[in-house]
C-alpha cells in the first residue's frame, strides 16, 4: 500500500510522515533535500536553475514511485511526484522563472512517466495558510530556505488548492492551521481517526 503526504513548503509533511510511520509501523520514504546538488543554487538564482532542479526532483520522485510499487509493505511517502509537475514547475513557469520551451519539455516527460505508474492508495493533503507556512519555515531555520520569496510560497499555495480541487483519487484533507498534530496528542488522534476511516472504513470520532 502507498500512502502519500502532500503540502506546501513548511506544512509539516516530514513531521507527519515520521509520526504516522511510528504509529502504524509503516515504512517512511522521505524527500531527500540535504544532498540535492541544485537546491541552494536554485534559491539564489531561480531562473537559471529552475529546469535543472525540477528535472532532478522528477527523476528522484519517479524512481521512488517505481520502487514503492515493487514492495509488499505499506509505504508512507513525504511529498508526491504530482507536486513537482502540477505545482512547482507550473508556478515557476507562471512567474517567468522557467521558459515555455523548458516547461513543455518537462511536462511531456512527466506525462510519459505517469503513464507507467499508479496513484497512491491515499493522498493526505496538508492545507495551510501563508502565515502558518512562513512561521514553520522560520522555526526550522534551514539555511537554503532563508532566501525563499513570500510571493513564491503564495503562488505555490494557490496552485496546491487548484490541484487538490481537481484531484480524482482517494484524498484526505487536513487543515494544519487548526490541527496541531505535532504538539497536541488529541489533534494527532483526530488525524489517526480520519486515516482509519479512509483506509479501514471506520468512523472517525466527532
What are these model-predicted stretches?
Residues 13:
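Conserved lysine of the Walker
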Residues 5:
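Hydrophobic anchor at the beta1->P-loop junction of P-loop NTPases
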Residues 86-159:
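A glycine- and Lys/Arg-enriched "phosphate-lid" helix/loop adjacent to the NTP-binding pocket
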Residues 22-60:
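Conserved substrate/cofactor phosphate-moiety recognition/catalytic segment
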Residues 134-206:
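NTP-dependent small-molecule kinase module
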Amino acid at each position: 500500500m502507498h500512502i502519500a503526504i502532500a503540502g506546501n513548503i513548511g506544512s509539516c509533511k516530514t513531521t507527519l510522515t515520521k509520526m504516522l510511520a511510528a504509529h502504524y509501523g509503516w515504512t517512511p520514504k522521505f524527500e531527500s533535500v540535504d544532498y540535492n546538488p541544485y537546491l541552494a543554487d536554485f534559491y539564489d538564482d531561480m531562473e537559471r536553475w529552475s529546469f535543472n532542479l525540477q528535472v532532478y526532483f522528477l527523476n528522484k520522485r519517479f524512481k521512488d514511485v517505481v520502487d514503492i510499487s515493487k514492495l509488499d509493505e505499506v509505504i508512507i511517502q513525504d511529498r508526491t511526484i504530482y507536486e513537482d509537475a502540477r505545482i512547482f514547475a507550473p508556478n515557476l513557469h507562471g512567474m517567468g522563472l522557467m521558459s515555455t520551451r523548458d516547461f513543455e519539455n518537462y511536462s511531456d516527460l512527466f506525462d510519459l512517466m505517469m503513464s507507467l505508474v499508479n496513484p497512491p492508495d491515499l493522498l493526505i493533503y496538508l492545507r495551510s495558510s501563508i502565515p502558518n507556512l512562513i512561521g514553520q519555515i522560520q522555526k526550522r531555520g534551514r539555511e537554503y530556505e532563508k532566501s525563499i520569496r513570500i510571493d513564491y510560497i503564495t503562488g505555490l499555495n494557490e496552485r496546491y488548492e487548484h490541484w487538490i480541487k481537481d484531484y480524482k483519487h482517494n484524498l484526505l484533507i487536513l487543515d494544519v492551521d487548526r490541527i496541531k498534530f505535532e504538539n497536541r496528542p488529541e489533534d494527532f488522534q483526530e488525524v489517526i481517526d480520519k486515516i482509519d476511516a479512509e483506509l479501514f472504513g471506520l468512523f472517525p470520532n466527532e
